[in-house]
Amino acid sequence: MKKTALLAALCSVVSLSSCCRIVDCCFEDPCAPIQCSPCESKKKDVDGGCNSCNGYVPACKPCGGDTHQDAKHGPQARGIPVDGKCRQ
């Protein structure tokens, strides 16, 4: 029983990490290639399966070595409010 529960938990973690989840829309990486935008991938995903964006993992970090302290990056670069709520 414990092995089954552990296996199920492990599979769910792996599947969550490999899918473009709708929650990623709040945290799109401004450096991401357009075709790997989590929101766009979710919209194009008609059959309900997972789209792993060819292994691309969204990340909130400055683009191209940008070191400006006041420059917006991560969610704020996409116009997402500081509180992290998704625009409807």
UniProtKB/Swiss-Prot annotation:
Alphabetical UniProt keywords: Cell outer membrane, Cell shape, Disulfide bond, Lipoprotein, Membrane, Palmitate, Signal
Signal peptide: 1-18
Lipidation (S-diacylglycerol cysteine): 19
Main location: membrane
PROSITE patterns from the UniProt entry: PROKAR_LIPOPROTEIN (PS51257)
GO molecular function: extracellular matrix structural constituent
GO cellular component: cell outer membrane
Pfam family, one: Chlam_OMP3
Source species, domain of life: Bacteria
GO biological process: regulation of cell shape
Keyword Disulfide bond applies: yes
Lipidation (N-palmitoyl cysteine): 19
InterPro entries: Cys-rich_OMP3_Chlamydia (IPR003517)
Subcellular location: Cell outer membrane
Membrane topology, as annotated: Lipid-anchor
Subunit structure, as described in the record: Part of a disulfide cross-linked outer membrane complex (COMC) composed of the major outer membrane porin (MOMP), the small cysteine-rich protein (OmcA) and the large cysteine-rich periplasmic protein (OmcB).
Role noted for this protein: In elementary bodies (EBs, the infectious stage, which is able to survive outside the host cell) provides the structural integrity of the outer envelope through disulfide cross-links with the large cysteine-rich periplasmic protein and the major outer membrane porin. It has been described in publications as the Sarkosyl-insoluble COMC (Chlamydia outer membrane complex), and serves as the functional equivalent of peptidoglycan.
Name this protein carries in UniProt: Small cysteine-rich outer membrane protein OmcA
Organism: Chlamydia trachomatis serovar D (strain ATCC VR-885 / DSM 19411 / UW-3/Cx)
